[in-house]
A protein has these predicted regions:
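Rossmann-like dinucleotide/phosphate-binding beta-alpha-beta segment
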Residues: 79-143
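Residue-level detector of flexible, active-site-proximal loop/helix-junction positions
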Residues: 23, 45, 71, 121, ...
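A short, charged, Gly/Pro-tolerant segment at domain boundaries
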Residues: 70-78
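Alpha-helix boundary recognition
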Residues: 9, 32, 72, 87, ...
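Phosphate/diphosphate ligand-binding glycine-rich loop within oxidoreductases
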Residues: 1-68, 83
């Protein structure tokens, strides 16, 4: 925020290098006013981000956190731990930039049907992968 930017300026900071893709957590107006340049990594490992999202999806659909906590306490029962198969389910991808495209391709590898929404659709890419762009309302309605 502006207070932090001003403290940095008082300490002769001229540049803030962000280890992320976006600027959403920096007061750009305050930084500009203080003469501090902001730089970022615009392609911050889109594969790692998409793969991490898939790992979280798998952990949740397979109840891995719950299974881990149970086994830690010596409880090896399977009740309530039966997971769901991703194969045959529909995945809705909101935004088909680099991360969204990689995520869609990874999930398609599990046999999921992929539907997409983006203000600026990449229809050529979607057609290549047999993915379908749908209106935003439909993305949230599909099961």
């Amino acid at each position: 925020d502006e207070t932090v930017i001003n403290i940095l300026k008082q300490n002769n900071v001229e540049l803030i290098a962000m280890r992320c893709a976006g600027y959403n957590n920096v007061d750009l107006t305050a930084a500009d006013k203080a003469g501090i340049k902001i730089v970022r990594v615009p392609a911050y490992s889109p594969n790692a981000v998409a793969e991490h999202a898939v790992a979280i999806l798998l952990a949740l659909t397979r109840h891995i956190p719950q299974a881990y906590l149970r086994t830690k306490t010596g409880n090896f029962t399977l009740t309530g731990l039966t997971g769901r198969n991703l194969n045959g389910l529909t995945a809705g991808i909101l935004g088909t930039g680099k991360i969204g495209q990689i995520m869609a391709e990874l999930l398609a590898g599990f046999g999921m049907k992929i539907i997409l929404y983006d203000l600026y659709p990449n229809k050529f890419w979607a057609t290549q992968h047999n993915f379908e762009y749908v209106p935003l309302e439909d993305l949230f309605k599909k099961k």
